[in-house]
Design a protein with these regions (language model features):
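Residue-level signal for pocket-adjacent positions within structured domains
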Residues: 1, 57, 98-99
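Short amphipathic alpha-helical interaction/hinge segments
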Residues: 20, 27, 48-55, 101
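Arg/Lys-rich, positively charged N-terminal/basic patches that mediate binding to nucleic acids
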Residues: 1-41
């Protein structure tokens, strides 16, 4: 089984920070924020192992660009990534109730 190095774009990092900050400071729930952060770390570790085996995005434009997705293991978030030269690059993190493939496609234009 291949093991991948996982890197996060600045945008993906900013998106994750925004979700964590919202949970911690707007909803005032430190425990939930810590839980999402732990789930992010756990999902990232899993991504190192399974990145090449997960399905491509449904949106044709993202699929053509090689983007795949992984859902957080315990929360309703998703990472959009592609594999470039054997390295996993996460370019977006979204809540699964968002129209995340459309939002991400528009961001790429």
């Amino acid at each position: 089984m291949d093991s991948y190095k996982v890197q996060f774009s600045d945008i993906a990092g900013t998106q994750l920070d925004a979700y964590i900050d919202y949970i911690q400071y707007e909803l005032m729930n430190d425990q939930a924020a810590a839980s999402v952060w732990s789930d992010f770390a756990e999902t990232s570790k899993e991504l190192e192992k399974v990145a090449g085996s997960l399905k491509f995005c449904d949106t044709p434009e993202l699929r053509e660009r090689g983007y795949r997705k992984i859902r957080f293991l315990h929360h309703r978030y998703v990472m959009l990534y592609k594999i470039v030269d054997g390295v996993v690059r996460v370019d977006g993190i979204y809540h699964e109730l968002q129209d995340y493939e459309h939002i991400f496609t528009e961001m790429l234009k």
